[in-house]
């Protein structure tokens, strides 16, 4: 018997990043981690910066960095509308490490709530990119 699946589209402002049949996905929603399996209840939620883990129809995994966006779950299709989406293979590790270093320095030198909040957001994005790079390397 074939595994239960559904259709997934991951779209950014620039292009369609993924379109295909999947077994499940994992993504960080506004209220926490979400695992979307076939037959999931309809849902519309914001996505926090982080990654989407895609388990394709035959079990292969793909990781994509998302800077945020919207997740829509319908009975037979799931759509991710991302602000920015970058495949793990396309991320630059040296650049992500430099962004992380700069954000950490900014946090240590921040002089107000706004500075700290912005630096914290930049740090979270850099860490998410590094995690996507790490998981993409492991999956290869």
From Swiss-Prot:
One Pfam family of this chain: ATP-synt_DE_N
What compartments host this protein? Cell inner membrane
Keyword tags: ATP synthesis, Cell inner membrane, Cell membrane, CF(1), Hydrogen ion transport, Ion transport, Membrane, Transport
Q: Cell membrane: is it a keyword of this entry?
A: yes
Q: Which Gene3D superfamilies match?
A: ATP synthase delta/epsilon subunit, C-terminal domain (1.20.5.440), F0F1 ATP synthase delta/epsilon subunit, N-terminal (2.60.15.10)
Tell me which InterPro entries the record gives: ATP_F1_dsu/esu_C_sf (IPR036794), ATP_synth_F1_dsu/esu (IPR001469), ATP_synth_F1_dsu/esu_N (IPR020546), ATP_synth_F1_esu_C (IPR020547), ATPsynth_dsu/esu_N (IPR036771)
* Membrane spanning residue stretches: none
Taxonomically, the superkingdom here is: Bacteria
A GO cellular-component term linked to this record: proton-transporting ATP synthase complex
Cite a single GO MF annotation: proton-transporting ATP synthase activity, rotational mechanism
Q: Name one GO biological process term.
A: proton motive force-driven ATP synthesis
Task: Give the membrane topology, semicolon-separated if more than one.
Answer: Peripheral membrane protein
Family label: Belongs to the ATPase epsilon chain family.
Summarize subunit and interaction data from the UniProt record for this chain. Answer: F-type ATPases have 2 components, CF(1) - the catalytic core - and CF(0) - the membrane proton channel. CF(1) has five subunits: alpha(3), beta(3), gamma(1), delta(1), epsilon(1). CF(0) has three main subunits: a, b and c.
Functional description taken from the UniProt entry: Produces ATP from ADP in the presence of a proton gradient across the membrane.
* The protein, known as: ATP synthase epsilon chain
Q: Which organism is it from?
A: Yersinia pestis
């Amino acid at each position: 018997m074939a595994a239960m699946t559904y259709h997934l589209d991951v779209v950014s402002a620039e292009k369609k990043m993924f379109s295909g049949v999947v077994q499940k996905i994992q993504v960080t929603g506004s209220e926490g981690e979400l695992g979307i399996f076939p037959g999931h209840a309809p849902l519309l939620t914001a996505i926090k910066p982080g990654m989407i883990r895609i388990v394709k129809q035959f079990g292969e995994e793909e990781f994509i960095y998302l800077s945020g966006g919207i997740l829509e779950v319908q009975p037979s299709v799931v759509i991710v509308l991302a602000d920015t989406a970058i495949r793990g293979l396309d991320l630059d590790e040296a650049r992500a490490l430099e962004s992380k270093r700069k954000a950490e320095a900014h946090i240590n030198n921040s002089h107000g709530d706004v500075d700290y909040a912005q630096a914290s957001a930049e740090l979270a994005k850099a860490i998410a990119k590094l995690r996507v790079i790490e998981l993409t390397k492991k999956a290869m």
